[in-house]
Amino acid sequence: MILSVIHIFLYFVPVLLAVAFLTLTERKVIGYVQLRKGPNVVGPYGLLQPIADGVKLFIKEPIKPSSSNPSVFFFAPMLALILALLLWMPVPLMDAFIELNFAVLFVLAISSLSVYSIMASGWSSNSKYALLGALRAVAQMVSYEVSLGLIILSLICLVGGFNLAQFFSAQEEVMLMLSCWPLGIMWFISTVAETNRSPFDLTEGESELVSGFNVEYSGGPFALFFLAEYANILFMNVLSALLFLAAHFSLLGVAVKVGLLAGLYLWFRASYPRFRYDQLMHLAWKSFLPLSLGLLMLNFSLPLTFSGIGGGL
């Protein structure tokens, strides 16, 4: 029992530390883009800033709106963080926490459940801003999960299995990002939209919704939402590296490729304005859905066609 707890602790603490320093990196990058230093006071070069932010948030009193549903209100951020950490369990970086033959389907299933934590937080806050932000987030995540699912199905047709280890062996000769670059580009843009990041951060339209679905949260519950969001960002980058960039040869290779993808996320946030909501939906349903569906049909029919030709010969 004690060893199991230690195993869980050792598996998830590096994820939370990576999340903490991703926030510091983001603030530094945005600072330099805006020709300023960013955090540089707490600790050497500002390295202790994430710890100071976390301590400040967790020692603050969590304020409950008088008209909210308290049980759902405080359960939603815990659910968000639990689901974000569950996503990491089948990832074989050093040693997977659980070995799953259907790891890709597990990832899709858990990522789709995160919609419920956002919906619960928006509804239980009993605030119009929070509810509108939650509705936007749910619509956006459901829309882009369709294209993510179709892209993964296309890759499964090419690789021939649902296990992440099979993606490693399939990329020994050439990365899937080179052979399937349209799928790779659509996948990356869809992951940005799935994690509600700029330029697809319609859920946090500050000029319209103040802060979106988490507008009524403060202190520890807000920090849990924050940790869940950045854990999802890191996980999507790790998954992108595993699926498309053949990031399985060394932990250093994984770290470098994930760092480059995270840098693209931060570059997008510093550079691009927010999409209009109708443009966001048109991109999902009128561009990505037909294209990913067509590529799925192509990738599904080609092996059948060539196997039929081989059998005839």
From Swiss-Prot:
TM annotation in the entry: 2-22, 72-92, 102-122, 148-168, 173-193, 222-244, 249-268, 293-313
Keyword set includes Mitochondrion: yes
Bilayer topology: Multi-pass membrane protein
A Pfam family the protein falls into: NADHdh
Catalyzed reactions: a ubiquinone + NADH + 5 H(+)(in) = a ubiquinol + NAD(+) + 4 H(+)(out)
Enzyme class: translocase
GO biological process: aerobic respiration
EC identifiers of the protein: 7.1.1.2
Origin superkingdom: Eukaryota
Assigned GO CC terms: mitochondrial inner membrane; respiratory chain complex I
A single MF term (Gene Ontology): NADH dehydrogenase (ubiquinone) activity
Keyword terms, alphabetized: Electron transport, Membrane, Mitochondrion, Mitochondrion inner membrane, NAD, Respiratory chain, Translocase, Transmembrane, Transmembrane helix, Transport, Ubiquinone
Compartments, record wording: Mitochondrion inner membrane
Family: Belongs to the complex I subunit 1 family.
Main function: Core subunit of the mitochondrial membrane respiratory chain NADH dehydrogenase (Complex I) that is believed to belong to the minimal assembly required for catalysis. Complex I functions in the transfer of electrons from NADH to the respiratory chain. The immediate electron acceptor for the enzyme is believed to be ubiquinone.
Matching PANTHER family: NADH DEHYDROGENASE SUBUNIT 1, NADH-UBIQUINONE OXIDOREDUCTASE CHAIN 1
Protein name per UniProt: NADH-ubiquinone oxidoreductase chain 1
Organism ancestry: Eukaryota, Metazoa, Chordata, Cephalochordata, Leptocardii
